Amino acid sequence: MSSQALDSAKIAFIEAAIEHGVLLFGNFTLKSGRQSPYFFNAGLLYSSSLLSTTAQAYAKVLSSSRIPDFDVLFGPAYKGISLAAVSAVSLYQQTGKDIGYCYNRKEKKDHGEGGTMVGAPLKGRIVIIDDVLTSGKAIREAIDILKASPEAKLVGIVQLVDRQEKGQSGSGKSTVQEVEEEFGVPVEPIIGLDDIVKYLESSGKWEKELQEVRKYRAEYGVQRS
């Protein structure tokens, strides 16, 4: 693990997530069946203060060198919708970059403007905004939506949390690493498991939780490339 200190945006996001019960420590059963000592519930990102902190963290990653220049943020329904919207606003406030955002409907609308897409036209260079990549099924469905739009080109994915753990495919790689290799685009998180460990180490208040997370990482963890 890198010894590099956490930056202020990551610290602010982790502290806000813990304060609002979004990042929890305990014993949780994941969809994969694994018993995890921590859990991130993006469904609780509903307060204005927490959304503001989250949006600022997204904007910082979106303006980093790892994410190529882009035109539109795509937030897959449903959790990605609000995340894409607030990220677009925060990015403009931080950098002055004026980009569009859009999202999909789960069901096609046959009245009014119709269609399955809402917001900016799905064309040009697209970055997908999402919460947590687990099996990779949801992100592949989002990418399929882009493939149906011939003028859209995926250039990157930004997610809230990279669990940095081995996927279910047996490759020994994380879902994030598999998606990066399969689609040839960077997948950047606001925070990863290593960042959570660093925060627990530096706080000095979470010794029991730190030991459990370390054990989990030792068994399932994958180092980011």
Swiss-Prot record:
It comes from the Eukaryota. Homodimer. Orotate binds at F39, F40, T134, R163. Gene3D superfamilies: 3.40.50.2020. Catalyzes the transfer of a ribosyl phosphate group from 5-phosphoribose 1-diphosphate to orotate, leading to the formation of orotidine monophosphate (OMP). This is Orotate phosphoribosyltransferase. Its EC number is 2.4.2.10. Pathway: Pyrimidine metabolism; UMP biosynthesis via de novo pathway; UMP from orotate: step 1/2. Signal peptide: none annotated. GO terms for cellular component: cytoplasm. It catalyses: orotidine 5'-phosphate + diphosphate = orotate + 5-phospho-alpha-D-ribose 1-diphosphate. It holds the Pfam family Pribosyltran. CDD domains: PRTases_typeI (cd06223). The keyword Nuclease does not apply. Belongs to the purine/pyrimidine phosphoribosyltransferase family. PyrE subfamily. GO terms for biological process: 'de novo' pyrimidine nucleobase biosynthetic process; 'de novo' UMP biosynthetic process; pyrimidine ribonucleoside biosynthetic process. The keyword Transferase applies. 5-phospho-alpha-D-ribose 1-diphosphate binds at residues 31, 78-79, 105-106, 109, 111, 130-138. The lineage of its organism: Eukaryota, Fungi, Dikarya, Basidiomycota, Agaricomycotina. InterPro entries: OPRT, Or_phspho_trans_dom, PRibTrfase_dom, PRTase-like. Keywords: Glycosyltransferase, Pyrimidine biosynthesis, Transferase. GO terms for molecular function: orotate phosphoribosyltransferase activity.
